[in-house]
Amino acid sequence: MQFSVVIPTYNRAGELKETLASLAKITNAGTWEVIVVDNNSADATRRVVVDAAANFPVELRYLIERQVGRSAALNTGIKAAAGEIIATTDDDVRFEPDWLQQAAEALEREQCDFVGGKVVPIWGGPKPAWLSDKGGRHWAVIALLDFGPEPVEFGKRYAPLGVNLAFKREAFDRSGLWDPGIGRKAGTLLGQEVREWMLRARDAGLRGMYAPKMVVHHVIPEDRLQKRYFRRWFYWHGVSRAMLYQQHPIDMHAPEETSIDFSKVHLVFGVPRYMYRSCFGSAIAMVKAGFDGEEVACFEHELALWFFLGVLRQRWRDRNRPPGAGKDSGKFVGATA
Protein backbone atom coordinates (compact mmCIF):
# COMPACT_ATOMS: atom_id res chain seq x y z
CA MET A 1 0.00 0.00 0.00
CA GLN A 2 1.32 3.45 -0.90
CA PHE A 3 -0.37 5.76 1.63
CA SER A 4 -1.85 5.70 5.12
CA VAL A 5 -3.58 8.87 6.35
CA VAL A 6 -3.76 9.15 10.15
CA ILE A 7 -6.29 11.51 11.76
CA PRO A 8 -6.37 11.90 15.56
CA THR A 9 -9.64 13.30 16.87
CA TYR A 10 -11.35 14.27 20.10
CA ASN A 11 -15.00 15.35 20.43
CA ARG A 12 -15.26 17.02 17.02
CA ALA A 13 -17.69 14.75 15.22
CA GLY A 14 -19.18 17.55 13.12
CA GLU A 15 -15.83 18.78 11.81
CA LEU A 16 -14.57 15.22 11.34
CA LYS A 17 -17.55 14.42 9.11
CA GLU A 18 -16.64 17.30 6.77
CA THR A 19 -12.95 16.37 6.87
CA LEU A 20 -13.70 12.80 5.79
CA ALA A 21 -16.01 14.04 3.05
CA SER A 22 -13.19 16.18 1.69
CA LEU A 23 -10.66 13.36 2.00
CA ALA A 24 -12.96 11.07 0.00
CA LYS A 25 -12.37 13.33 -3.02
CA ILE A 26 -8.62 12.64 -3.12
CA THR A 27 -7.45 11.66 -6.61
CA ASN A 28 -4.38 9.99 -8.17
CA ALA A 29 -3.28 8.51 -4.85
CA GLY A 30 -2.77 4.91 -5.91
CA THR A 31 -3.54 2.53 -3.06
CA TRP A 32 -4.31 4.18 0.26
CA GLU A 33 -6.20 3.93 3.54
CA VAL A 34 -7.49 6.25 6.26
CA ILE A 35 -7.14 5.61 9.99
CA VAL A 36 -9.16 7.72 12.43
CA VAL A 37 -7.89 7.47 16.01
CA ASP A 38 -10.49 8.48 18.60
CA ASN A 39 -8.83 9.87 21.73
CA ASN A 40 -11.73 9.15 24.14
CA SER A 41 -14.45 11.22 22.48
CA ALA A 42 -17.83 11.44 24.18
CA ASP A 43 -19.74 12.58 21.09
CA ALA A 44 -20.83 10.86 17.86
CA THR A 45 -17.29 10.38 16.52
CA ARG A 46 -17.57 6.61 16.15
CA ARG A 47 -20.91 6.86 14.34
CA VAL A 48 -19.49 9.47 11.95
CA VAL A 49 -16.61 7.16 10.98
CA VAL A 50 -18.82 4.07 10.65
CA ASP A 51 -21.29 5.94 8.45
CA ALA A 52 -18.53 7.43 6.28
CA ALA A 53 -16.83 4.04 5.89
CA ALA A 54 -19.92 2.57 4.21
CA ASN A 55 -19.33 4.64 1.06
CA PHE A 56 -15.70 5.66 1.39
CA PRO A 57 -13.56 5.04 -1.71
CA VAL A 58 -10.84 3.19 0.28
CA GLU A 59 -10.62 1.39 3.61
CA LEU A 60 -11.55 3.71 6.49
CA ARG A 61 -10.65 2.35 9.92
CA TYR A 62 -11.71 3.47 13.38
CA LEU A 63 -9.34 2.96 16.32
CA ILE A 64 -9.49 4.08 19.95
CA GLU A 65 -6.54 5.33 22.00
CA ARG A 66 -7.30 5.67 25.71
CA GLN A 67 -4.06 7.45 26.64
CA VAL A 68 -4.86 11.15 26.56
CA GLY A 69 -3.01 13.28 24.04
CA ARG A 70 -2.58 13.89 20.32
CA SER A 71 0.85 12.26 20.30
CA ALA A 72 -0.45 9.01 21.78
CA ALA A 73 -3.29 8.95 19.24
CA LEU A 74 -0.88 9.53 16.36
CA ASN A 75 1.36 6.71 17.58
CA THR A 76 -1.58 4.30 17.60
CA GLY A 77 -2.42 5.22 14.02
CA ILE A 78 1.18 4.99 12.83
CA LYS A 79 1.63 1.54 14.36
CA ALA A 80 -1.50 0.33 12.58
CA ALA A 81 -0.62 1.92 9.24
CA ALA A 82 0.17 -0.26 6.23
CA GLY A 83 1.32 2.49 3.87
CA GLU A 84 4.87 3.15 2.72
CA ILE A 85 4.09 6.85 3.16
CA ILE A 86 2.30 7.91 6.34
CA ALA A 87 0.49 11.26 6.23
CA THR A 88 -0.79 12.96 9.37
CA THR A 89 -3.43 15.65 9.57
CA ASP A 90 -6.24 16.95 11.82
CA ASP A 91 -10.00 16.58 12.06
CA ASP A 92 -10.81 20.13 10.85
CA VAL A 93 -9.12 20.15 7.45
CA ARG A 94 -10.14 20.28 3.78
CA PHE A 95 -7.79 18.80 1.19
CA GLU A 96 -6.70 19.65 -2.32
CA PRO A 97 -7.57 16.60 -4.48
CA ASP A 98 -3.89 16.03 -5.34
CA TRP A 99 -2.70 16.30 -1.71
CA LEU A 100 -1.24 12.80 -1.48
CA GLN A 101 0.12 12.87 -5.01
CA GLN A 102 2.00 16.10 -4.25
CA ALA A 103 3.39 14.57 -1.04
CA ALA A 104 4.73 11.54 -2.88
CA GLU A 105 6.22 13.63 -5.68
CA ALA A 106 7.94 15.96 -3.20
CA LEU A 107 9.44 13.05 -1.26
CA GLU A 108 10.80 11.60 -4.49
CA ARG A 109 11.96 14.89 -6.02
CA GLU A 110 13.69 16.21 -2.90
CA GLN A 111 15.08 12.80 -1.86
CA CYS A 112 14.13 13.54 1.75
CA ASP A 113 12.51 11.62 4.60
CA PHE A 114 9.48 13.79 5.34
CA VAL A 115 7.64 16.74 3.85
CA GLY A 116 5.30 19.38 5.19
CA GLY A 117 3.05 21.54 3.08
CA LYS A 118 1.20 24.81 2.89
CA VAL A 119 -1.75 25.42 5.24
CA VAL A 120 -4.23 28.09 4.16
CA PRO A 121 -7.24 29.38 6.13
CA ILE A 122 -10.96 28.84 5.92
CA TRP A 123 -12.08 31.76 8.06
CA GLY A 124 -14.90 31.04 10.49
CA GLY A 125 -15.28 34.76 11.18
CA PRO A 126 -13.84 38.12 10.14
CA LYS A 127 -10.05 38.22 10.12
CA PRO A 128 -9.03 40.67 12.87
CA ALA A 129 -7.00 43.77 12.04
CA TRP A 130 -4.25 42.76 14.46
CA LEU A 131 -3.57 39.50 12.60
CA SER A 132 -0.74 39.84 10.09
CA ASP A 133 -1.31 39.04 6.42
CA LYS A 134 2.34 38.05 6.03
CA GLY A 135 2.67 35.08 8.34
CA GLY A 136 4.98 35.14 11.33
CA ARG A 137 4.46 34.08 14.92
CA HIS A 138 0.75 34.96 14.85
CA TRP A 139 0.03 32.31 12.24
CA ALA A 140 1.29 29.42 14.34
CA VAL A 141 -1.57 30.00 16.78
CA ILE A 142 -4.18 29.05 14.20
CA ALA A 143 -1.95 26.53 12.37
CA LEU A 144 -1.38 28.42 9.13
CA LEU A 145 1.82 28.10 7.12
CA ASP A 146 3.17 29.53 3.88
CA PHE A 147 6.93 29.60 3.27
CA GLY A 148 6.50 30.77 -0.31
CA PRO A 149 6.46 29.13 -3.75
CA GLU A 150 9.77 27.27 -3.55
CA PRO A 151 10.86 24.22 -1.50
CA VAL A 152 12.98 24.96 1.57
CA GLU A 153 14.66 22.62 4.01
CA PHE A 154 13.25 22.42 7.51
CA GLY A 155 15.71 23.40 10.20
CA LYS A 156 16.81 26.56 11.98
CA ARG A 157 14.38 28.94 10.29
CA TYR A 158 11.60 26.64 9.14
CA ALA A 159 9.42 24.04 10.84
CA PRO A 160 6.33 22.23 9.53
CA LEU A 161 2.89 21.96 11.10
CA GLY A 162 1.39 18.66 12.22
CA VAL A 163 -1.77 19.37 10.25
CA ASN A 164 0.03 18.73 6.94
CA LEU A 165 2.88 16.22 7.11
CA ALA A 166 3.91 13.08 5.23
CA PHE A 167 6.71 10.68 6.15
CA LYS A 168 8.49 7.80 4.57
CA ARG A 169 7.63 4.85 6.77
CA GLU A 170 11.25 4.18 7.71
CA ALA A 171 11.58 7.70 9.17
CA PHE A 172 9.77 6.46 12.29
CA ASP A 173 11.95 3.36 12.44
CA ARG A 174 15.03 5.58 12.54
CA SER A 175 13.89 8.38 14.86
CA GLY A 176 11.00 6.87 16.80
CA LEU A 177 7.38 7.82 17.27
CA TRP A 178 5.92 10.96 18.85
CA ASP A 179 6.72 11.54 22.51
CA PRO A 180 3.39 11.05 24.37
CA GLY A 181 4.64 13.30 27.16
CA ILE A 182 4.70 16.29 24.81
CA GLY A 183 1.91 17.82 22.76
CA ARG A 184 -1.76 18.68 22.86
CA LYS A 185 -3.94 17.22 25.59
CA ALA A 186 -7.57 17.94 26.41
CA GLY A 187 -7.91 21.10 28.50
CA THR A 188 -4.51 22.51 27.49
CA LEU A 189 -2.86 24.14 24.50
CA LEU A 190 0.38 22.21 24.90
CA GLY A 191 2.41 21.71 21.75
CA GLN A 192 5.96 21.22 20.45
CA GLU A 193 5.50 17.54 19.57
CA VAL A 194 6.58 18.21 15.99
CA ARG A 195 9.61 20.23 17.13
CA GLU A 196 10.63 17.48 19.57
CA TRP A 197 10.38 14.81 16.87
CA MET A 198 12.37 16.99 14.47
CA LEU A 199 15.23 17.24 16.97
CA ARG A 200 15.43 13.45 17.09
CA ALA A 201 15.05 13.25 13.32
CA ARG A 202 17.96 15.63 12.89
CA ASP A 203 20.10 13.55 15.24
CA ALA A 204 19.17 10.45 13.21
CA GLY A 205 20.31 12.14 9.99
CA LEU A 206 16.83 12.64 8.51
CA ARG A 207 15.93 15.53 6.20
CA GLY A 208 12.60 17.29 5.85
CA MET A 209 11.44 19.70 3.14
CA TYR A 210 8.67 22.22 2.68
CA ALA A 211 6.49 21.19 -0.27
CA PRO A 212 4.58 24.29 -1.49
CA LYS A 213 2.19 22.34 -3.74
CA MET A 214 1.10 20.01 -0.92
CA VAL A 215 -1.86 22.11 0.27
CA VAL A 216 -4.56 21.76 2.90
CA HIS A 217 -7.19 24.23 4.09
CA HIS A 218 -7.60 24.63 7.85
CA VAL A 219 -10.89 25.69 9.41
CA ILE A 220 -10.34 28.60 11.83
CA PRO A 221 -13.32 28.93 14.22
CA GLU A 222 -14.38 32.45 15.16
CA ASP A 223 -13.60 31.84 18.84
CA ARG A 224 -9.93 31.37 17.91
CA LEU A 225 -9.80 34.77 16.27
CA GLN A 226 -9.86 36.51 19.64
CA LYS A 227 -6.91 38.08 21.45
CA ARG A 228 -7.63 36.07 24.58
CA TYR A 229 -7.15 32.83 22.64
CA PHE A 230 -3.85 34.05 21.19
CA ARG A 231 -2.62 35.07 24.65
CA ARG A 232 -3.57 31.71 26.09
CA TRP A 233 -1.91 29.87 23.18
CA PHE A 234 1.36 31.76 23.56
CA TYR A 235 1.40 31.15 27.31
CA TRP A 236 1.05 27.40 26.70
CA HIS A 237 3.59 27.69 23.89
CA GLY A 238 6.05 28.93 26.50
CA VAL A 239 5.16 26.07 28.83
CA SER A 240 5.64 23.60 25.97
CA ARG A 241 8.99 25.08 24.91
CA ALA A 242 10.23 24.87 28.51
CA MET A 243 9.16 21.21 28.65
CA LEU A 244 11.11 20.63 25.44
CA TYR A 245 14.10 22.43 27.00
CA GLN A 246 13.90 20.04 29.93
CA GLN A 247 14.38 17.10 27.56
CA HIS A 248 16.81 18.64 25.06
CA PRO A 249 19.17 21.52 25.87
CA ILE A 250 18.02 23.97 23.19
CA ASP A 251 17.91 27.62 22.31
CA MET A 252 14.51 28.64 23.71
CA HIS A 253 13.89 30.90 20.70
CA ALA A 254 15.22 28.57 17.98
CA PRO A 255 15.27 24.89 19.04
CA GLU A 256 17.23 23.76 15.99
CA GLU A 257 20.10 26.19 16.71
CA THR A 258 23.24 24.17 17.40
CA SER A 259 25.93 26.83 17.90
CA ILE A 260 25.20 27.58 21.57
CA ASP A 261 27.62 26.43 24.26
CA PHE A 262 25.11 25.49 26.95
CA SER A 263 27.81 25.26 29.61
CA LYS A 264 28.07 29.05 29.33
CA VAL A 265 24.34 29.80 29.46
CA HIS A 266 23.50 31.42 32.81
CA LEU A 267 20.12 30.59 34.35
CA VAL A 268 17.95 32.84 36.52
CA PHE A 269 15.12 30.90 38.20
CA GLY A 270 15.84 28.15 35.70
CA VAL A 271 15.40 30.44 32.68
CA PRO A 272 18.34 31.38 30.40
CA ARG A 273 19.42 34.92 31.14
CA TYR A 274 19.19 35.91 27.48
CA MET A 275 15.41 35.42 27.69
CA TYR A 276 15.10 38.17 30.29
CA ARG A 277 16.88 40.55 27.94
CA SER A 278 14.56 39.46 25.14
CA CYS A 279 11.51 39.94 27.37
CA PHE A 280 12.62 43.44 28.35
CA GLY A 281 13.17 44.30 24.70
CA SER A 282 9.70 43.01 23.78
CA ALA A 283 8.11 45.11 26.54
CA ILE A 284 9.83 48.27 25.29
CA ALA A 285 8.92 47.48 21.68
CA MET A 286 5.29 46.81 22.65
CA VAL A 287 4.97 50.21 24.34
CA LYS A 288 6.59 51.99 21.41
CA ALA A 289 4.40 50.21 18.85
CA GLY A 290 1.34 51.10 20.92
CA PHE A 291 2.24 54.79 20.93
CA ASP A 292 2.92 54.65 17.19
CA GLY A 293 -0.46 53.02 16.51
CA GLU A 294 1.11 49.87 15.06
CA GLU A 295 -1.54 47.40 16.19
CA VAL A 296 -0.07 44.26 14.61
CA ALA A 297 3.44 44.88 15.96
CA CYS A 298 2.15 45.88 19.39
CA PHE A 299 0.20 42.66 19.84
CA GLU A 300 3.03 40.53 18.45
CA HIS A 301 5.41 41.95 21.08
CA GLU A 302 2.77 41.39 23.76
CA LEU A 303 2.54 37.73 22.76
CA ALA A 304 6.30 37.40 23.30
CA LEU A 305 5.68 38.40 26.93
CA TRP A 306 3.00 35.73 27.34
CA PHE A 307 5.47 33.21 25.91
CA PHE A 308 8.04 34.28 28.50
CA LEU A 309 5.52 33.89 31.33
CA GLY A 310 4.81 30.33 30.20
CA VAL A 311 8.52 29.52 30.10
CA LEU A 312 9.04 31.04 33.55
CA ARG A 313 6.14 29.08 35.04
CA GLN A 314 7.35 25.73 33.74
CA ARG A 315 11.02 26.33 34.47
CA TRP A 316 10.14 27.27 38.06
CA ARG A 317 8.38 23.93 38.36
CA ASP A 318 11.45 22.19 36.93
CA ARG A 319 13.96 24.36 38.83
CA ASN A 320 15.62 21.43 40.61
CA ARG A 321 16.10 19.43 37.42
CA PRO A 322 18.93 20.27 35.00
CA PRO A 323 18.17 20.63 31.26
CA GLY A 324 18.09 17.23 29.60
CA ALA A 325 17.07 15.43 32.79
CA GLY A 326 13.62 14.70 31.41
CA LYS A 327 14.84 12.87 28.32
CA ASP A 328 13.60 9.28 28.22
CA SER A 329 13.45 8.01 24.68
CA GLY A 330 12.56 4.48 25.73
CA LYS A 331 8.88 5.26 26.02
CA PHE A 332 8.40 6.43 22.45
CA VAL A 333 11.19 5.07 20.26
CA GLY A 334 10.48 1.89 18.35
CA ALA A 335 8.03 2.66 15.70
CA THR A 336 6.15 0.67 13.19
CA ALA A 337 7.17 -2.91 13.77
Model-derived segments and their meaning:
Residues 12-25:
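Short, well-formed alpha-helical segments that are part of the catalytic scaffolds
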Residues 65-81:
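Glycine-rich, basic loop-to-helix element that forms the pyrophosphate-binding segment
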Residues 98-132:
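Conserved donor NDP-sugar-binding/catalytic core segment of glycosyltransferases
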Residues 134-158:
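Short, flexible, basic/aromatic active-site loop/helix in glycosyltransferases
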Residues 86:
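Short aromatic/hydrophobic "clamp" motif used to bind/position activated sugar donors
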Residues 162-167, 171-176, 181-214:
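A short, conserved alpha-helix in the catalytic core of glycosyltransferases
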Residues 38-47, 93:
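A conserved acidic beta->alpha catalytic loop
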Residues 233-236, 250-337:
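Non-catalytic, C-terminal membrane-associated alpha-helical segments of glycosyltransferases
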